[in-house]
Amino acid sequence: MKVQRMAYEMGRYISEEDLAKLIAETSGYPWRWWQQPTLLTPRLWKTLEMLNQIKVHTTKYHNELNRLLKTGKFISDLQLACQAVPRPLTIALFCTLLLWAAEYSFCGEKEETWARCKSAAKVLYSLLQDRV
């Protein structure tokens, strides 16, 4: 039997800034707009590769989150999603939330996208600190 790892374990290894960078890289924003990759460490590149693999298989979860939660108020929707997830939170479910947040962080301007990425990272990082 495979044991699910708990998401709060990630909180020891990843910072809020790291989360913002991961969200930015998975948001769909072209690299040329960032002018350089934001993930400069091998650890974060490995995490990004894992997230991109998960992204391929989470479409039905994204659709369900969209159907249930998308009101057009990005941070409110993300906070509601974080409150509604089952506890204890697994890494797989956390990654699904991160990818969903990345999808809605993307907008037409680099500065606004980065601001949304940072806001989403703050919400998700607080979720990592929750051991309930």
From Swiss-Prot:
Species per Swiss-Prot/TrEMBL record: Snake adenovirus serotype 1 (SnAdV-1)
Protein name as catalogued: Protein LH2
Superkingdom assignment: Viruses
